[in-house]
Amino acid sequence: IFIPGLLQTPEFARARVDAERTLGPVDYSADRAAAGRLGRQRMLRRPDGPTYHVVIDELAIRRATAPPEVLRAQLLHMAATVNGSPKMTAQVLPVTASIEAYGTPRSAFSIYTFADPGDPTVVTVDTVTDDLLLTEVEDVRRYADLFGRLRQAAMPTEESIELLIEIARDLAVRS
């Protein structure tokens, strides 16, 4: 359902916070959240930065989650950010994809591994109000297995970039 924060433009992030405000007060600043994401995005682009692999549900890029011009710019930003990057991949999971054992996530999640082998792999699971932090080996293994299945069922990065651009063009025509 979501476009990952590390790939969000400031305008898209603000639009999402504005949408959240319709459900009730939020206790954070959209501008500060966007600035933090931009800082983390810069870390991704550093030569010594981390690798980043993301699988995005096709519905997340097709659903009207922001005004059309904001969503269009968001999709083009994602395509440009990932295109040609040796350390980033973005794969779109088509709605028609067949996932091994029909395993689908119940919500968005992230897996963090660290260069230091002494640091444990950590999984965060997104909820409406907070992120759950999982460190138990079996929990982490299950999410790693699920992520592998999602990557296998998703489109290759090149095709995913083409789809992002195609949907952005369609938004321009409809706007």
Regions found by a protein language model. Name each.
Residues I1-S175:
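Hydrophobic protein-protein interaction segments
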